[in-house]
Amino acid sequence: KICYNQPSSQHPTTKACPGEKNCYRKQWSDHRGTIIERGCGCPTVKPGVKLHCCTTEKCNN
């Protein structure tokens, strides 16, 4: 699986995730504004954090 892993609105970068079925995108807001985190897997998130998990290549931008 290839997933995007760049933070927020930075230039897209990808990461190979051997054996992983999912990619994810987490989004939340704080004093800096909207923060986006991308990576491999499908993590558990705290209340108030938007989570999008998906199963195709590079699906989490």
UniProtKB/Swiss-Prot annotation:
It is found in: Secreted. Its main location: secreted. SUPFAM superfamilies: Snake toxin-like. GO terms for molecular function: acetylcholine receptor inhibitor activity; ion channel regulator activity; toxin activity. Keywords: Acetylcholine receptor inhibiting toxin, Disulfide bond, Ion channel impairing toxin, Neurotoxin, Postsynaptic neurotoxin, Secreted, Toxin. One of its GO terms (cellular component) is extracellular region. Disulfide bonds join C3-C23, C17-C40, C42-C53, C54-C59. Expressed by the venom gland. Binds to muscle nicotinic acetylcholine receptor (nAChR) and inhibit acetylcholine from binding to the receptor, thereby impairing neuromuscular transmission. Belongs to the three-finger toxin family. Short-chain subfamily. Type I alpha-neurotoxin sub-subfamily. This is Short neurotoxin 1. It comes from Naja annulata annulata (Banded water cobra).
